[in-house]
């Protein structure tokens, strides 16, 4: 809903960057549509604006499934890649590190001529496999360490992984963040009653303040300097978007 996001941006004073592309759930009405045809729609979102508005996308997104890039999501990945090649906008990638799915995604991007220094492989702190994460970084990509507090790996171990990557010399391409969901449907309890708060709020009561209240103090305790924290949370995201 680009109009809603524009209203929130104006009311809050926060710069919200709209996304074009598609997430994990491939819609039935797009089955059989070619990557080139999809790319035309994504490019229109960037150059003209989302349909019925003059609000333009500033970043491209694609996704993979848990174990691999399905045939349908490969079409979407190639469409996103072609959109990037045409527009030069950065590409954020929903990935699953537990299956090392980024290896398949990066292969597709190479085939499509993507500049891998404009790619960010997200949800990467769902693993502590440092060698796999280094491999992604060695391809030129940014690493989205963006599932705080997360569930598959403890918040502290996510930060330990982040610190290990900083120590290994990759600090200029790491982007820690929340992947926080603040609005979602309330699900009833087994007895049919409604909970007083959403499960996401119970899991992460700090919501968008989690990084500030939990992660940055943890990093400082590990010896990460203020300058390095500035690089992680300000300089790296800016460089990723600006190119």
What are these regions (language model features)?
Residues 90-97, 118-126:
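Catalytic beta/alpha-barrel core
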Residues 122-127, 146-164:
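Active-site glycine- and acidic-residue-rich loops that bind
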Residues 71-75, 98-113, 129-137, 162:
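Distinct, well-ordered alpha-helical segments
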Residues 7-10, 15-90, 141-142, 147-152:
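Active-site gating/metal-coordination segments in enzymes
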């Amino acid at each position: 809903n680009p109009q809603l996001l524009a209203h929130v941006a104006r009311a809050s004073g926060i710069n919200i960057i709209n996304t074009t592309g598609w997430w994990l759930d491939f819609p039935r009405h797009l089955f059989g549509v070619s990557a080139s045809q999809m790319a035309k729609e994504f490019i229109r979102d960037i150059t003209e604006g989302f349909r019925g508005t003059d609000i333009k996308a500033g970043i491209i997104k694609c996704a993979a499934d848990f174990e691999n890039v399905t045939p349908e999501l490969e079409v979407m990945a190639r469409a996103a890649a072609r959109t990037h090649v045409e527009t030069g906008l950065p590409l954020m990638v929903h990935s699953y590190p537990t299956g090392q799915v980024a290896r398949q995604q990066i292969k597709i991007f190479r085939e499509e001529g993507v500049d891998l220094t404009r790619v960010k492989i997200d949800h990467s702190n769902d693993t502590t496999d440092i060698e796999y994460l280094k491999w992604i970084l060695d391809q030129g990509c940014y690493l989205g360490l963006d599932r705080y507090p997360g569930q598959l790996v403890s918040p502290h171990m996510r930060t330990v992984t982040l610190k290990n990557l900083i120590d290994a010399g990759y600090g200029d391409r790491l982007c820690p963040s929340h992947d926080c969901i603040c609005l979602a449907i309330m699900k009833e309890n087994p007895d049919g009653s409604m909970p007083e708060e959403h499960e996401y709020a119970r899991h992460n009561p700090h919501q968008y303040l989690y990084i500030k209240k939990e992660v940055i103090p943890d990093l400082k305790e590990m010896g990460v300097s203020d300058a390095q924290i500035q690089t992680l949370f300000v300089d790296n995201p800016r460089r990723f978007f600006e190119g």
